Amino acid sequence: MYLLSRRSVLSAAGAATGALALDAAFPNLVRAASDDAFSVFTADAMGGLVDSTLVLGESNALLIDSQFTKPNAEKLRDTIQATGRTLETIFITHFHPDHHFGVGVLKEAWPEASLVAHPAVAGMLAEMGQGMFDQRKEKMGDALPDTWLAPEPLSGGLTLEGETFEVLEPMIGDTKQITPVHLPQFDALVAADLVYNGTWAWLKEVPDAKSADAWLQSLGELEAMGVAVIVPGHRAEGAANDASGIAHNQKLLQAWKKALDETKTADDLKAAMVEAMGELPGAFFLDVAVNAVRG
């Protein structure tokens, strides 16, 4: 978990500030020079290497995405509690389960916290979320939390202690209806699954060049914002919070388009991607994609 202050973000894009561990239980939780800060919690491999972003106010906190597995959601809960803040709001960026199945753990700890999403995302989850959770829970058992809750449609903006953060309109990435969050106070963007940094991406919903081009267009729009700090939806260990994630995704999607055009079988498609990108974390994502497209 990397803690970034406004001052350090503006002076050194994406650099972690300070090196003081909160305690031995959280060796990756680094204090900032200022309490006006945000931090990023990254899941382990079983949790899909997914990022949750925590914005820290003086007394309260805002969380963007809530993890997938029960162990990672519990670690996230413990990490938030260690900051001394009260979790005020949980915002969900899109309907993929690895970004919201952990809400039950967090709502148990902070029952008064608001759980919200862009109306388009909230509508999708109201329709499909509980069934999706029940199906996965039956297969995964104790690896998932015991309960799930649907977010309410966001109205009136995303705020914390007088600061307002911009929820962008839905964009196309590894799925439709992804809603990044712009944190202008930190010159930062929580890109969710529009950006993977250093890992394979979820390409199951990108079966052709047209869908890859739609994602590339979204990446171009993010790039044009010129934001210094870009928090990916998933990251490899040590991957930065910066535009390197956009570049990684652009390279990956161009390789995917080429491989789709030049291969006929799942094995050949996978081999072409590994040749183009090398071995990356999140191999499960690639395996699912090649079998969905060529299986």
Mark where each language-model region is.
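N-terminal export signals
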Residues: 1-3, 8-29
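C-terminal regulatory/interaction regions
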Residues: 10, 14, 265-295
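Conserved beta-strand hairpin/beta-sheet module of binuclear metal-dependent hydrolase folds
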Residues: 33-82, 180-193
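Active-site environment of divalent metal-dependent phosphoester hydrolases
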Residues: 49, 70-71, 95-100, 122-125, ...
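Active-site neighborhood of phospho(di)ester-bond hydrolases with catalytic His/Asp-centered motifs
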Residues: 64-66, 89-96, 116-118, 190-192, ...
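Active-site HxH/HxHxD metal-binding segment of metal-dependent hydrolases
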Residues: 85-157
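Core dinuclear metal-dependent hydrolase active-site scaffold
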Residues: 155-186
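Divalent-metal (often Zn2+) His-rich catalytic cores of metallo-beta-lactamase-fold enzymes
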Residues: 182, 188, 213-268, 272
